[in-house]
């Protein structure tokens, strides 16, 4: 469906393009602020929001995820993975999260401390989590997961500290 934005690039093909045409040269001047959300941090917000079936999903610093009613801005739920603050010493370039992915009723999140987490998109409840890095090394995860042919793929960070990519 054209109005959905299910991953960082919009579609699973990562086109970074919306075919919708309601906003154009003639209508752009009529745009205004409908609502906004404040977060409990002043750290950088780098993730692309997702829009699915009337809900906006946003990831923020410390790997938190929020769901909002797109029309009203009402917060539907918040997920906090309780990322340990001590992980900050392993991070070179900011306590950030660069996005989430959605697939078949779940929101997928890579946490700063290296977990891949599946969150129920309707309730915000954690369904499962899996450690994806060697916790004894200087790994972190800041990138958005991708879904490819039903498989969730996540990369790691930490090259500044001599860890290997895999």
PLM features: what roles do these ranges have?
Residues 2-9, 44-64, 89-115, 140-161:
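Repeat-blade elements of multi-bladed beta-propeller folds
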Residues 162-166:
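Structural motif
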């Amino acid at each position: 469906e054209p109005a959905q934005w299910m991953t960082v690039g919009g579609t699973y093909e990562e086109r970074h393009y919306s075919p919708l045409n309601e906003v154009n040269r003639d209508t752009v001047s009529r745009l205004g602020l409908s609502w906004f959300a404040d977060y409990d941090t002043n750290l950088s917000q780098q993730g692309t929001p997702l829009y699915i079936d009337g809900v906006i999903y946003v990831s923020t610093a410390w790997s938190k995820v929020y769901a909002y009613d797109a029309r009203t801005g009402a917060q539907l739920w918040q997920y906090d993975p309780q990322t340990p603050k001590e992980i900050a010493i392993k991070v070179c370039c900011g306590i950030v999260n660069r996005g989430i992915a959605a697939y078949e009723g779940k929101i997928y999140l890579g946490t700063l401390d290296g977990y891949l987490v599946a969150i129920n998109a309707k309730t915000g409840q954690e369904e499962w989590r899996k450690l994806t890095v060697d916790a004894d090394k200087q790994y972190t995860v800041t990138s958005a997961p991708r879904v490819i042919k039903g498989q969730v793929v996540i990369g790691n960070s930490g090259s500044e500290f001599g860890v290997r990519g895999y």
